[in-house]
Regions:
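Structured alpha/beta reader/binder surfaces that contact nucleic acids or chromatin modification marks
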Residues: 1-189
Length: 189
């Protein structure tokens, strides 16, 4: 099943873990997924504290995004007010939200539900993503690409069905697959 892997700063992860933040703000939304879908949470290392309840540099859990709220920011920086009550659950101050999304632009509020947190946070390399041939090595140079030439012709294929390990966290979010090991590693919050 296709999912998202989302990078979230440690201070926001802490609020999510405490149940205080139930909306995550983003400038974009996945076009290939419809709600509900699973979002894995990667706690970023930037400005992180080691003594936090949210372990930096790890996949700390996941949530189900059961609704995406469009956030329209007008040219003057005002946010369309009909959805502000929901957006307050993001814990992002009004002016910061407008600045982040950009004047005259549309952003998105991902509603967080069914939060599950790992007892032992996972390394990013335990995540999987799709290889679309846009990587630096291209398919012909990829370590997962198999090519064989014979008198009857040549044969080539991707040995991993275009699903590869994630090697670095996403800037914001990326598509991933529900292949992260979960054996007794989750608790329900």
């Amino acid at each position: 099943m296709r999912c998202l892997l989302m990078s979230i700063k440690q201070n926001w992860c802490e609020l999510i873990l405490k149940g205080e933040k139930t909306i995550e703000i983003r400038k974009s939304r996945p076009q290939e997924l419809s709600t509900p879908f699973k979002c894995y949470i990667y706690c970023t290392k930037t400005g992180a504290k080691e003594d936090s309840i949210a372990k930096p540099g790890k996949v700390i859990g996941y949530f189900i995004c059961d609704k995406i709220i469009p956030i329209r920011v007008f040219e003057d920086g005002l946010i369309q007010d009909w959805n502000w009550n929901s957006l307050e659950k993001s814990k992002v101050p009004y002016d910061d939200m407008a600045t982040y999304i950009g004047h005259g632009k549309i952003g998105y509020g991902y509603q967080i539900s069914n939060l599950k947190i790992y007892k032992e946070p996972l390394d990013i390399t335990e995540s999987k993503t799709i290889c679309n041939g846009d990587c630096d090595s291209k398919c012909e140079k990829c370590k997962y690409y198999y090519y064989e030439s014979s008198e009857d012709g040549s044969y080539a294929e991707c040995m991993v069905n275009n699903i590869i390990d994630v090697t670095r966290p996403p800037q914001s979010w990326m598509y991933t697959y529900e292949e992260i090991p979960r054996n007794d590693k989750t608790i329900i919050i």
